[in-house]
Curated annotation (Swiss-Prot):
Biased composition (Basic and acidic residues): 14-24
ATP-cone domain mapped to chain residues: 49-139
UniProt keywords, alphabetically: ATP-binding, DNA-binding, Metal-binding, Nucleotide-binding, Repressor, Transcription, Transcription regulation, Zinc, Zinc-finger
Family: Belongs to the NrdR family.
Gene Ontology molecular function terms on file: ATP binding; DNA binding; zinc ion binding
Cofactor annotation comment: Binds 1 zinc ion.
Name of the protein in question: Transcriptional repressor NrdR
Gene symbol of the encoding locus: nrdR
Residue ranges covered by zinc fingers (unnamed): 3-34
One Pfam family it belongs to: Zn_ribbon_NrdR
Length: 151
């Protein structure tokens, strides 16, 4: 590793520890020449996960976008933000563990709804109404009936 101060190639690691929920390793280093200390982070390089939209367009997976949608569905509901953040991480982990580089948006939506139904019924119906694009009240009532039968 090259020293940022003197550009010398020789450095030694003084300390290593997990960082960012064990997604990276933080290392304290010291230059062997000028004794400058600095920090580096080592992370696994993840391949981008592409979402295939209904119209065939592709866009990179965005955990922020998913979280915004969940926050909107859970507005004025007793669902802690931390619960939603964990759900987003769980969905992303599930998608990445499948090993595919491209995933249909329908599959992502189903994973989200499956988890949201276990957390809050009202938020689930809100999310489903937008995600499944309910066209009329009959579709809405059908979804509510199915939800009530599950419970």
């Amino acid at each position: 590793m090259r020293c940022p101060k003197c550009q010398h190639n020789g450095t030694r690691v003084l300390d290593s520890r997990p960082s960012d929920e064990s997604r990276s390793i933080k290392r304290r280093r010291e230059c062997e020449k000028c004794l400058q200390r600095f920090t580096t982070y080592e992370t696994v390089e993840e391949r981008p996960l592409l979402i295939i939209k209904k119209d065939g367009m592709r866009e990179e997976f965005s955990s922020d976008k998913m979280l915004r949608g969940l926050v909107r569905a859970c507005e004025k509901r007793p669902v802690p933000l931390e619960t939603l953040e964990k759900m987003v991480l769980d969905v992303e982990r599930t998608l990445r563990n499948e090993g595919k580089q491209e995933v249909r948006s329908q599959d992502v939506g189903e994973l989200v709804m499956e988890r949201l139904a276990k957390i809050d019924d009202v938020a689930y119906v809100r999310f489903a109404s937008v995600y499944r694009q309910f066209k009329d009240i009959n579709v809405f009532i059908k979804e509510l009936t199915e939800l009530m039968n599950k419970n």
